[in-house]
């Protein structure tokens, strides 16, 4: 079996192009499995995985848990809100106590940038980063690449624009790294206040005009405004944001071109996307959710082979 070059999935930046190709190829095989009447395989039988989430999650947590069960792994779920973290226990103490129960792998989401990288220096178990602050969300980028490949036949040479709150998005950074490693052209589009100053150093195009960005791209990956991470006001109102940066059917129809619409969720309908776009034939948003299970199965399976 081919192996990944890494023991942990901490970020896309750490992966080689071959790593990404291996994950997506393996995910394709697992997608066939989960569409069968019997959806489980014994690949991770006797492997115990802890989902350690310090931030709220719906799609990512459910997707990881389902991926683990499809692989026949034993799964335990940790919620910070109901734990000794509330009593002052440190992150490392919390995780070491979980590992003392003979857990083999940690899937972690944390509000602090670099939290999984810190753990990787102190523990022996495999770690999967399910999102660290505004830094990276590697499995989201991998499932996005898988979905583009499935829809358009490949990623290389495609023009992908990431729209919205780039400044506070961990999805944006992971996608930029993943897309570039696979030969795609990448652009970001949003208000100047929500585009980080360093973004040009990553070799991506920057556009502030929504219509021009849509005319350029084959794929629009649309991000929500992350109000929970904003400490100052970056634009006057959500209504004004929607007026200048919201994608609606009328706008798409006027472009007279096919654009694939993606969104990592949750969608703020009527803000970054209108319902008639989110639910249209342009959208592969629910395909992304479906593909997330297969991609996370691939990540867990391949990491389990890299002790």
Curated annotation (Swiss-Prot):
GO biological process: 'de novo' pyrimidine nucleobase biosynthetic process; 'de novo' UMP biosynthetic process; amino acid metabolic process
Keyword vocabulary terms for this entry: Pyrimidine biosynthesis, Transferase
Catalytic activity: carbamoyl phosphate + L-aspartate = N-carbamoyl-L-aspartate + phosphate + H(+)
Annotated carbamoyl phosphate binding sites: 59-60, 109, 137, 140, 265-266
Pfam families per the UniProt record, alphabetical: OTCace (PF00185), OTCace_N (PF02729)
Catalytic EC class: transferase
Binding-site residues, L-aspartate: 87, 170, 224
Gene3D superfamilies: Aspartate/ornithine carbamoyltransferase
Keyword Transferase appears in the UniProt entry: yes
InterPro entries: Asp/Orn_carbamoyltranf_P-bd, Asp/Orn_carbamoylTrfase, Asp/Orn_carbamoylTrfase_sf, Asp_carbamoyltransf, Asp_carbamoyltransf_Asp/Orn-bd
PROSITE patterns found in the cross-reference section: CARBAMOYLTRANSFERASE
SUPFAM superfamilies in the record: Aspartate/ornithine carbamoyltransferase
Pathway field: Pyrimidine metabolism; UMP biosynthesis via de novo pathway; (S)-dihydroorotate from bicarbonate: step 2/3
GO molecular function: amino acid binding; aspartate carbamoyltransferase activity
Protein name per its UniProtKB record: Aspartate carbamoyltransferase catalytic subunit
Organism: Cytophaga hutchinsonii (strain ATCC 33406 / DSM 1761 / CIP 103989 / NBRC 15051 / NCIMB 9469 / D465)
Gene name in the database record: pyrB
């Amino acid at each position: 079996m081919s192996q990944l070059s890494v023991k942990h999935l901490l970020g896309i930046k750490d992966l080689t192009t071959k790593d990404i190709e291996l994950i997506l190829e393996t995910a394709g095989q697992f997608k066939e499995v989960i569409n069968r009447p019997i959806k489980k395989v014994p690949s991770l039988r006797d492997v115990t995985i802890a989902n350690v989430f310090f931030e709220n999650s719906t799609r990512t947590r459910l997707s990881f848990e389902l991926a683990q069960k499809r692989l026949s792994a034993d799964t335990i779920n940790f919620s910070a809100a109901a734990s000794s973290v509330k009593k002052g226990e440190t992150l490392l103490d919390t995780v070491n106590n979980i590992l003392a129960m003979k857990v083999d792998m940690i899937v972690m989401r944390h509000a602090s940038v670099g939290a999984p990288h810190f753990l990787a220096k102190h523990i022996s178990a495999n770690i999967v980063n399910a999102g660290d602050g505004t830094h990276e969300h590697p499995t989201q980028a991998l499932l996005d690449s898988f979905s583009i490949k499935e829809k358009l036949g490949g990623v290389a040479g495609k023009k992908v624009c990431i729209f919205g709150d780039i400044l506070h998005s961990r999805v944006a950074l992971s996608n930029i790294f993943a897309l570039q490693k696979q030969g795609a052209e990448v652009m970001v589009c949003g208000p100047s206040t929500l585009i980080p100053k360093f973004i040009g150093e990553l070799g991506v195009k920057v556009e502030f005009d929504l219509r021009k960005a849509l005319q350029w791209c084959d794929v629009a990956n649309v991000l929500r405004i992350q109000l929970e991470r904003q400490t100052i006001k970056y634009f006057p109102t959500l209504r004004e944001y929607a007026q200048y940066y919201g994608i609606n059917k009328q706008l798409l129809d006027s472009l007279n071109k096919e654009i694939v619409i993606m969104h990592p969720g949750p969608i703020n309908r009527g803000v970054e996307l209108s319902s008639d776009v989110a639910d249209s034939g342009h959208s592969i948003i629910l395909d992304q959710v479906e593909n997330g299970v297969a991609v996370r199965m691939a990540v867990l399976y391949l990491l389990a082979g890299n002790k």
